[in-house]
Curated annotation (Swiss-Prot):
GO annotation, biological process: rRNA catabolic process; rRNA processing; tRNA processing
Sample GO molecular function, one term: 3'-5'-RNA exonuclease activity
Residues annotated for phosphate binding in this entry: R86, G124, T125, R126
UniProt name for this protein: Ribonuclease PH
Keyword entries, A-Z: Nucleotidyltransferase, RNA-binding, rRNA processing, Transferase, tRNA processing, tRNA-binding
InterPro entries: ExoRNase_PH_dom1 (IPR001247), ExoRNase_PH_dom2 (IPR015847), ExoRNase_PH_dom2_sf (IPR036345), PNPase/RNase_PH_dom_sf (IPR027408), Ribosomal_Su5_D2-typ_SF (IPR020568), RNase_PH (IPR050080), RNase_PH_bac-type (IPR002381), RNase_PH_CS (IPR018336)
E.C. code: 2.7.7.56
Role of this protein: Phosphorolytic 3'-5' exoribonuclease that plays an important role in tRNA 3'-end maturation. Removes nucleotide residues following the 3'-CCA terminus of tRNAs; can also add nucleotides to the ends of RNA molecules by using nucleoside diphosphates as substrates, but this may not be physiologically important. Probably plays a role in initiation of 16S rRNA degradation (leading to ribosome degradation) during starvation.
SUPFAM superfamilies in alphabetical order: Ribonuclease PH domain 2-like, Ribosomal protein S5 domain 2-like
Length: 238
């Protein structure tokens, strides 16, 4: 039995609340158990310099944690004057994942910036960020369509992400902080609605994992992501 009494293959309670803030073209509060992330999508009717004149758009992401989103207060990165390597890695992951769901040619010369701000962290902040941000991105693209700034829907399909891990040689789905801190291996998996992989990040913390264990973790991740895609579709009213 797990720390929070879940089954090995059970997600934490997942909530996706759209239109959470007033001004952003897309805004979502996503909750994976006690992990809560505010994801906003903002439209800029221009593109970075390296894309000017190419007739395509761009999707990028930023990620941050509120100072008291964790058990003890962490300094704001702005106060330190630079982002940590972890922050840079996570926001690049979010950006890569979200670009996989968009036909950038159909987006026109528009940029959508995703901001993922962790309000409360209990493991899986990057996977929750991707899952919530995907919904916010859909809403932002629908704004562009409604305003007739683009002619075709750029959406190729939803994406979602989940963590899995090995703990005492058993595969666990959707790790909370305590599980993540004590597991032998943890994997972060990002997949498309079509069941294709975008990213697999895996690290053996305690002891190496076998090919069979890797396959078992990926199968568990596929199951969890399929459930998350359904949650996204429900939130979008599809």
């Amino acid at each position: 039995m797990r720390i929070d009494q879940r089954a090995l293959d059970q997600l934490r309670e997942v909530k996706i609340t759209r239109n959470y803030t007033r001004y952003a073209e897309g805004s979502v509060l996503v909750e994976f158990g006690h992990t809560k992330v505010l994801c906003t999508a903002s439209i800029d009717n221009s593109v970075p310099r390296f894309l000017k004149g190419q007739g395509q758009g761009w999707v990028t992401a930023e990620y941050g944690m509120l100072p008291r989103s964790t058990h003890s207060r962490c300094d704001r990165e702005a106060a330190r004057g630079k982002q940590t390597g972890r922050t840079q890695e996570i926001q690049r992951l979010i950006g890569r994942s979200l670009r996989a769901m968009v036909d950038l040619k159909k987006l026109g010369e528009n940029t959508i910036t995703i901001d993922c701000d962790v309000i409360q962290a209990d493991g899986g902040t990057r996977t929750a960020s991707i899952t919530g941000a995907a919904v916010a991105l859909v809403d932002a693209m629908n704004v562009l369509l409604a305003q007739k700034k683009i002619k075709q829907d750029p959406l190729k399909g939803l994406v979602a992400a989940i963590s899995v891990g090995m703990y005492q040689d058993e595969v666990l789905l959707d790790l909370c902080y305590e599980e993540d801190s004590n597991c032998q291996t943890d994997l972060n998996v990002v997949m498309t609605q079509a069941g294709e992989f975008i990213e697999i990040q895996g690290t053996a913390e305690d002891k190496p994992f076998t090919r069979a264990q890797s396959n078992a973790m990926l199968e568990m991740a596929e199951k969890g992501i399929a459930e998350l895609i359904k949650k996204q579709q429900e939130a979008l009213g599809w």
